[in-house]
Amino acid sequence: MASSHSSSPVPQGSSSDVFFKKEVDPTKHVRPVQSLPDVCPKEPTVTDQHRWTVYHSKVNLPAALNDPTLAKRESDFFTKTWGLGFVDTEVIPSLYLPQISKEHFIAYQQEISQREKIHERCKNICPPKDTFDRTLLHIHDKSRTDLEQVPKIFMKPDFALDDSLTFNSVLPWSHFNTAGGKGNRDAASSKLLQEKLSHYLDIVEVNIAHQISLRSEAFFHAMTSQHELQDYLKKTSQAVKMLRDKIAQIDKVMCEGSLQILRLALTRNNCVKVSNKLKLMATVHQTQPTVQVLLSTSEFVGALDLIATTQEVLQQELQGVHSFRHLGSQLCELEKLIDKMMIAEFSTYSHSDLNRPLEGECQVLEEERLVSLVFGLLEQRKLNFLEIYGEETIITAKNIIKECVINKVAQVEEIDTDAVVKLADQMRMLNFPQWIDLLKDIFSKFTIFLQRVKATLNVIHSVVLSVLDKNQRTRELEEVSQQRSAGKDNSLDTEVAYLTHEGLFISDAFSEAEPASAAVDTTSQRNTSPHSEPCSSDSVSEPECTTDSSSSKEQTPASATLGGVDIIVSEDMRLTDLELGKLASNIQELLCNASDVCHDRAVKFLMSRAKDGFLEKLNSTEFIALSRLMETYIVDTEQICGRKSTSLLGALQSQANKFVNRFHEERRTKLSLLLDNERWKQADVPAEFQDLVDSIADGKIALPDKKPAATEDRKPADVLVVEGHQYAVVGTVLLLIRIILEYCQCVDNIPSVTTDMLTRLTDLLKYFNSRSCQLVLGAGALQVVGLKTITTKNLALSSRCLQLIVHYIPVIRAHFEARLPRKQWSLLRHFDHITKDYHDHIGEISSKLIAIMDSLFDKLLSRCEVEAPAPSPCFRNICKQMTKMHEAIFDLLPKEQTQMLILRINASYKFHLKKQLSHLNVINDGGPQSGFVTADVAFYTGNLQALKGLKDLDLNMAEIWEQKR
């Protein structure tokens, strides 16, 4: 049996490759069977035979889609139902997979070729020990056949007789059953089973022995090298022990002390952190009582800062602490309560600030309280506090007027407050002096009120600007810190961090073990006070005491000093620069709105007094006083708020327009009455009018405040002397000059009516010109006044009056030009038109005088005969009329104008005389007729030149004769 199993089952290397492969495959049956997971259950189970499982699948979807035998008619299997998108497409090669060629293996071949050569050389030096031949192969086949006789159950890796199934399979119970008459047969079966098992054992032992014999040399080599291996292991063990001893000594000398220092430093830092945590928890625990104390003293900013800091600590340092799980929500509710308290406190402050007595200096009421409130409101983004202040200003403005009216009415004894219940009706019972005093009081109170509002808003504006400045400086510091941190990151990247056995970086350990104070050395501090506390609650600047959130903030809160109050601008101000800028502009707008409110209330006060026509009945002096008072108040409010309010200015302009209309209508009516009663005779000039004209010449265009006492003793003059020129005038013109000065003075007193006054004055001058023309040239005075005739003296006096007005028109123009804005200078052209109209009127009067004499000459000379005696009666009559004309105009008109009129009259005389001589055929031939004419002309010339101012007048009488041809 042993010989039958001595053949080797391993094929030899002399066989061909094909034979080798075929012979190697059966050896796989000799290997131990590997246990694989059961896919299907081995034991019979009850299953649903109709239930479909994955094991029923015969063809999968990829196989169906990639079927090479797909018929052409089935190419539209998917497209006919699902669309043209479901068609066979060619798969594009991946762009990420390179094309592999032989060049890619060149480096590998060069690297492996050397190893291959060494391998081949070793094969040649050490040939295979086992050689295969046909005999061994036969023996191997025989041994394999013997092994196949052994049941497979003995070859299982999980073979165990303690398993009942395995035991029953190996030793069936039927061989041990001794019942009945079958005992002998069962004994034989048991013996046969024992022999069979022994046979199986022999086969296995033979195969094992054969395998050992095949590897005998390896066993002997292993046994031989065992002693050498033991020596190597012993030496290695000794070397390892020595190395471990050295490492232990090195660790004890060089590392253990340092690591112990690190452990102690870490332990110390951890203890410090725990201590600081406990102190922080104790501080946080006192937050609510501290907030209550701060609120009791109205320290809203401090309370809000404390709440914000506590919230930050709860979220960062004390996150997850169970005892503080409800503190965050409680602080949020407390913060909402503080918001309501601040709004109520600011409303109370506004009421008390604006309703205090309007007397004394305009100081801010409790500036510290105001600054604290504003900072708190800004920190909480409660920006509607300005609306509260604006509403309070409206209410206060109403109360100011009401209080002033009540006080004034109480001072007037004539007003029965019991009979007149309404306050507005009581106010209307005041006369102008009382009412103007009341208005002065109201304007004074409004001015003080606005100054107080401005002072308060300036404090609020300063707070807003300080917060805005803090935001800008914080951004600058953040930019600088970012640049520095970027530089630090670059330097930290180059540092080497060593990892200890506890997983801590040494650099981190040393950084955490830095001294509590920068001025004290670490070693000396540890030696001098090893048990001292590294940090206290007060020394928050030390690194151990700083929390993560506080240490990360490099910027310190900005401080501001407002009105002597030091305020720390919190880092938690959540307002943007845009919001702060808008808030600052709203503060200025609020001041302007307060001014507008005061103006609106003043307008309502004026309108309530004007209901009964009180303002329209004011005289010039009273209205000017009212206008100046209102203009002064408008200027004062403009200086306070920097913007001119228009409501009161509009009301003043409206009343001024009404005043101008009434003023003009009164003067126009007065002038019309004067002209209608004017008899156009020369009037005496009182001394006050002469003084008035003199003051105009001195550049003072205004009426005197009082009538000088010296003028009452002076007698009236015959003429008005203006800059050395004498003007004979009628009484209407004197009063017209005074009226013109009233217009000019009204412009000075009320500059806003300059334009209206200019148009009204030009209208008045036009009216005087047209009306005087109607009365004198148009002979309207005959019916209006009852004159019998319009004499040459009337005409000359009218002309001289017009000349006086023309003299003053440039003065009036210059006065208005100095008070009109440049863009309205075009209105001054009306004075040019008026001047032209006046000159035309004066020319028409001169023409009228000439026409009178012309008709007289035509009448007298047409009946004149050249005969004795000389001078003839006709010429005597002409000389008489010329003398009357001269007497009528010489004292009224200036000398130059008189001479010009005489020359023009003389020309008319020569024209008619020449015409008559031509009619009579009288020529200058030296005959008797020419002698008579020459005597008459000489008489006329002598008589005319004998008059005042006409002595040197060149009459040129030779023109009366026809020129000889």
Swiss-Prot record:
Residues 520-558 have a biased composition (Polar residues). Residues 228-249 form a coiled coil. InterPro entries: Vps54, Vps54_C, VPS54_N. Its main location: Golgi. Ubiquitously expressed at low level. It comes from Rattus norvegicus (Rat). Acts as a component of the GARP complex that is involved in retrograde transport from early and late endosomes to the trans-Golgi network (TGN). The GARP complex is required for the maintenance of the cycling of mannose 6-phosphate receptors between the TGN and endosomes, this cycling is necessary for proper lysosomal sorting of acid hydrolases such as CTSD. Within the GARP complex, required to tether the complex to the TGN. Not involved in endocytic recycling. This is Vacuolar protein sorting-associated protein 54. One of its GO terms (biological process) is musculoskeletal movement. Residues 516-558 are annotated as: Disordered.
